[in-house]
């Protein structure tokens, strides 16, 4: 009888130990899956921008951050703005032809540091707050117009905000000429109307990005934005 009780105790103890081990393993596994899933979600939301299709077609937006080791050779324009030296010949040719056509563009903004980008965003948020927006709404609205540091094409040196010398022509003159002709020089209007849901940025008729002549012509003819174009290359 004692042997039987002793045997039952051993069986019971082994069963309890098994349950503890099983339950502990299950919880640990579930936690690992949950944490791993969180990591995957974060990774899907925040990729590092890739130059797989060439430096000209690197997509930088709110979901694709500029690599920490990204390098460029900057050159300074006559008005103090800076751009990637690789796009200078095409930008200069475009501006020369525009002026010959009676249109007078200039680069209002070129390359920006992360600190400069942050300051612009902060100023935009402050402006909306002064208009009575809540903190959350001010931030959300500001980010429709100003990219977070690390997600702005201005930090690539490949994008320029173009304005008009209004003493000689109107802004509309410049924007209309650029819409019709910029692709010939490898530039596209990066944030066109009707594409905000894809680009994440409201229509900016002044923001132009160098993508190379071949891609620019195909984007111009198709009506795609850069995200759609690169997606079609995959």
Language model features: what each stretch is:
Residues 2-13, 17-234:
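Extracytoplasmic cell-surface/polysaccharide-interacting catalytic and binding patches
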């Amino acid at each position: 009888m004692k042997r039987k009780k002793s045997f039952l105790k051993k069986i019971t103890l082994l069963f309890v130990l098994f349950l503890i081990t099983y339950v502990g393993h299950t919880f640990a596994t579930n936690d690992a899956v949950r944490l791993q899933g969180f990591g995957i979600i974060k990774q899907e939301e925040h990729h590092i921008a890739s130059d797989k299709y060439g430096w000209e077609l690197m997509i930088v937006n709110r979901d694709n951050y500029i690599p920490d080791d990204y390098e460029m050779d900057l050159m300074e324009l006559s008005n103090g703005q800076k751009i990637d030296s690789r796009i200078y010949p095409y930008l200069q040719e475009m501006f020369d032809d525009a002026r010959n056509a009676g249109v007078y563009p200039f680069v209002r903004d070129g390359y920006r540091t992360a600190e400069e980008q942050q300051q612009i965003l902060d100023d935009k948020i402050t402006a909306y707050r002064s208009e009575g927006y809540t903190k959350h709404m001010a931030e959300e609205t500001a980010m429709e117009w100003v990219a977070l540091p690390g997600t702005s094409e201005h930090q690539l040196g490949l994008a320029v905000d173009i304005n008009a010398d209004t003493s000689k022509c109107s802004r509309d003159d410049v924007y209309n000429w650029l819409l019709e002709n910029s692709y010939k020089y490898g530039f596209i209007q990066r944030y066109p109307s009707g594409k905000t849901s894809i680009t994440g940025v409201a229509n900016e008729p002044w923001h132009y990005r160098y993508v190379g002549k071949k891609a620019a012509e195909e984007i111009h003819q198709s009506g795609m934005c850069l995200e759609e174009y690169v997606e079609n290359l995959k």
